[in-house]
Amino acid sequence: MYQPDFPPVPFRSGLYPVVDSVQWIERLLDAGVRTLQLRIKDRRDEEVEADVVAAIALGRRYNARLFINDYWRLAIKHQAYGVHLGQEDLQATDLNAIRAAGLRLGVSTHDDMEIDVALAARPSYIALGHVFPTQTKQMPSAPQGLEQLARHVERLADYPTVAIGGISLARAPAVIATGVGSIAVVSAITQAADWRLATAQLLEIAGVGDE
């Protein structure tokens, strides 16, 4: 049963782009996306605070679900919709502070053991990856593939799930067909020849999510 320790998110969050700049956040919100993540890596809090503030303000303006990757203190300080954490960040994060601030929590997983760890934290949603080979970040694990993804989705049948990793426009329909609630994409949009067209096509496949 879906009883998170954090505020819930819709069972289906639809298309979920993960981007590294406020410019991309604004572009995608304007294009109709309603679930996004700002992921800026390896910078100090004070270096990214202005971007976090601007992204959160845009999310509010468009009534969107904007998650901040990693910078949970800034997300709390400026009242983001939610925080996304990698498995390696869970131990070093004050989950009680995130919960007390009323922020949603998403957690990355790569196998059954990490799903167990995520479930113990009772987050708002669980991300499952990486589904396909990806150039976006170095991954210590092998790609899961569609069969493994479908198995994880079945295991988490009543939990909001997000598939991530190497999901292209061509692969998106098969990923959605597993029953996963959301697809997170990076280069499928940011490296597309026509990002507006790619976004529109991905929205057609994955939707904007439930209200």
Swiss-Prot record:
GO CC list: cytoplasm
Keyword Magnesium annotated: yes
Cofactor: Mg(2+)
Gene: thiE
Name of the featured protein: Thiamine-phosphate synthase
Cross-referenced InterPro entries: Aldolase_TIM (IPR013785), ThiamineP_synth_sf (IPR036206), ThiamineP_synth_TenI (IPR022998), TMP_synthase (IPR034291)
Organism name: Escherichia coli (strain K12)
EC number(s) on file: 2.5.1.3
Keywords: Magnesium, Metal-binding, Thiamine biosynthesis, Transferase
EC top class, as a word: transferase
NCBIfam families, alphabetized: PRK03512.1, thiE
Functional note: Condenses 4-methyl-5-(beta-hydroxyethyl)thiazole monophosphate (THZ-P) and 2-methyl-4-amino-5-hydroxymethyl pyrimidine pyrophosphate (HMP-PP) to form thiamine monophosphate (TMP).
Listed GO MF terms: magnesium ion binding; metal ion binding; thiamine-phosphate diphosphorylase activity
